[in-house]
């Protein structure tokens, strides 16, 4: 923190206590991202589905709120059978918009051994040895667009405002961000792309970097954010919904981020489409590498390349060989 960084703790929360949280705050912790989902096989929560786990999420959110001044985020890995629970998780987050700052849904991905072979240079690799290749479900190709469709069944006006595209597939949404404004009782609207551009550009001009995590006090300034409605039509609509009841101006309006992350996609020609400009890069052996693929770095020292199993047939069909 003394170096101008924002120390964020990514954790399952099992060992966190109010006493430890207080010590970490004194040490400079900026925020917590709790990874909680029904596939973790948690002691005491093994039978709970995503909706049931909202009770556990609330425990951690209240703990951080009681300590004060610490950003509160939740991650959940989304599988085919848990996709339907996202609207209920967002309902819970809406109900606690005053203490929950960010909800992140990470779509599950697994090593694809059905359609591609893996190579390190000329050597074929058995990727079954890596830990993230266990118990692969039927679907490992859910897209961010599908998640949005599911959310809109409950929140028809749900509207993302910013994204990162794929490194190999520019029209894919790898990080898809939405920002909603509301109270515990009602969501009034969403931030538009113009407002997000203004915020990020202004922050970059002032500090030379882009805005990510914010203190909880900033998430309570939803009314101030409505001023950007002069330039952003989504916030303008939000403003008019909000002032229909003039007495609302005496209540706090909260901002809450919702992020959908779509990890690596395997394209038909074997290319791997990663997140372009990935914010979760980590330093390994003096280089920036994808943190979600550290197992390959640890075991092989490189990210492994993929080629279609029927590559020879494809090349012959195209008269390349």
Where does each model-flagged region fall?
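Soluble, non-transmembrane catalytic domains of enzymes that act on hydrophobic metabolites at membranes
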Residues: 154-158, 162
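Radical SAM enzyme core and accessory elements
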Residues: 164-165, 172-321
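A structural signal for well-ordered alpha-helical scaffolds and beta->alpha junctions
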Residues: 57, 86, 140-148
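Short secondary-structure transition/capping segments
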Residues: 23-29, 59-64, 115-130, 166, ...
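Amphipathic alpha-helical segments that form well-ordered structural scaffolds
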Residues: 59-63, 146-153
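Flexible glycine/acidic-rich beta-alpha junction loops that bind and position SAM and/or redox cofactors
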Residues: 42-45, 81, 100-146, 162-182
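A structural signal for short, well-ordered beta-strand segments and their strand-loop junctions
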Residues: 73, 102-105, 162-163, 282, ...
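Radical SAM/AdoMet-radical enzyme domain recognition
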Residues: 1-107
């Amino acid at each position: 923190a003394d170096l101008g960084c924002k120390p964020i703790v990514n954790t399952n929360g099992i060992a966190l206590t109010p006493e430890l949280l207080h010590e970490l705050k004194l040490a400079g912790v900026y925020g917590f991202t709790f990874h909680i989902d029904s596939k973790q096989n948690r002691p005491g929560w093994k039978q709970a589905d995503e909706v049931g786990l909202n009770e556990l999420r609330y425990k951690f959110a209240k703990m951080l709120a009681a300590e004060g001044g610490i950003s509160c985020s939740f991650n959940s890995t989304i599988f085919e059978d848990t996709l339907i629970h996202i609207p209920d998780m967002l309902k819970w987050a809406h109900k606690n918009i005053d203490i929950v700052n960010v909800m992140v849904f990470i779509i599950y991905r697994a090593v694809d051994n059905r359609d591609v072979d893996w190579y390190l240079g000329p050597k074929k690799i058995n990727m079954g040895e890596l830990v993230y290749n266990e118990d692969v479900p039927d679907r490992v190709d859910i897209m961010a667009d599908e998640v949005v469709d599911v959310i809109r069944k409950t929140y028809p006006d749900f509207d993302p405002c910013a994204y990162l595209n794929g490194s190999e597939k520019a029209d894919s949404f790898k990080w898809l961000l939405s920002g909603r404004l509301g109270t515990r009782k009602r969501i009034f609207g969403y931030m538009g792309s113009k407002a997000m551009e203004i915020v990020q550009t202004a922050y970059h001009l002032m500090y030379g970097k882009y805005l990510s995590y914010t203190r909880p006090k900033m998430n309570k300034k939803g009314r101030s954010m409505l001023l950007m409605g002069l330039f952003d039509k989504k916030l303008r609509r939000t403003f008019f919904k909000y002032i229909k009841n003039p007495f609302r101006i005496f209540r706090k309006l909260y901002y809450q981020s919702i992020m959908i992350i779509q990890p690596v996609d395997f394209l038909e020609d074997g290319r791997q489409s990663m997140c372009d400009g990935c914010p979760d890069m980590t330093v390994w052996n003096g280089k920036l590498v994808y943190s979600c693929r550290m197992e390959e770095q640890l075991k092989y020292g490189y990210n492994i390349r993929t080629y279609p199993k029927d590559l020879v047939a494809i090349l012959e069909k195209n008269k390349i060989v």
